[in-house]
Amino acid sequence: MIAVALTARPSYTKLKPILDHLEDFVIVSCASANLVDYGEVALQAERDFPGKVRRVYSTLAGNTLQTTAKDAGVLLQSLADVFADIDPAIVVVMADRYETLTASIAARYQNIPVAHIQGGERSGNVDDVVRDANSALAAYHFPATHLASLRVHSLTGSQHIYNYGCPSIDLAKQALLDPPVTVQEIGGAGAPLDFNQRFAIVLHHPETEQPNEAFNQMRTVLDGVRQAGLPALIIWPGQDAGRDLTAKAVRVVTQKHPEWSTHTCRGVAPRRFLRLLSQASVLVGNSSAGIREASYLGVPVVNVGARQRGRERAGNICDVEYDDYLWMVMVDVSKLKFPSAALYGSGDAGIRIAAKLTELTRKGV
């Protein structure tokens, strides 16, 4: 059996194309993936894979640096028990959030091999340390780019590095075949936006190392979109220190400017989100979706701040700081069109990763 750690809303976009091609597996859903405030992506996983999801609850209230550290400790204890109970052949972890590191530790210290997806990347903050620690603990590696694979090899010396691309590109490719998304399909609250007209998607998280600045930073981003004259779909941020301040800024700005057409929601199902992203005039914020999926979809991105600073990027990205001139950048960038870029893959990563994981389990790793 393969155990797949699902730790947050964005991770499911990358994991589902792999899960679609696995047979003997269990999804261990934990942290914010289980919580309504963050979109409860575990519920989507339960719909997609009935009987395959095991929930683990550990998240503490507060969204501060201290509660983040304590969350990791609580989750480590829980995952150690879960892995001891199900005794998987491999534990799969994704990327760089702190919750993934607890899964790697809980598995590795019980002599369960770890397969790490999306190692070797750089974002310019503490996530780099977590990502590299996951790679160091892992036996098998599935980086998303050639440069990332070189970094993983330099770090680990492993002969088990498989550069198949990012699985979320598979989902983006599939989403383009779907009919356009309407505001009624995504739920949430606010103005009944017409997604056939120009609009922005705002997806912005607190800067990892500046949680106390989250309110002012989000307010600057929102004011920029508003001053650019773009209706906006605002998706609530994920579970990070400073998240409550980011959410407060959304409430303050939208209430202060009722004339601005906005719609807010906690989350959108992964494939539906990617179809919606393909319809947007621009993605604004600091989500890795702008770096990965938006590059494949050819969607312009105004990437704000330092959260994604070190990422490999295609030509659709315009990097800016938090300042009063954001609106001018958004006006210009939102009018641009870009070709599809295959930097993070061409849409076949999921089936290839699943095949390799299945092969490894059959060999007894």
Q: Predicted segment positions?
A:
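A conserved nucleotide-sugar
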Residues: 24, 222-237
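C-terminal amphipathic helix plus adjacent low-complexity
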Residues: 331-365
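A nucleotide-sugar donor-handling region in carbohydrate enzymes
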Residues: 32-37, 137-216
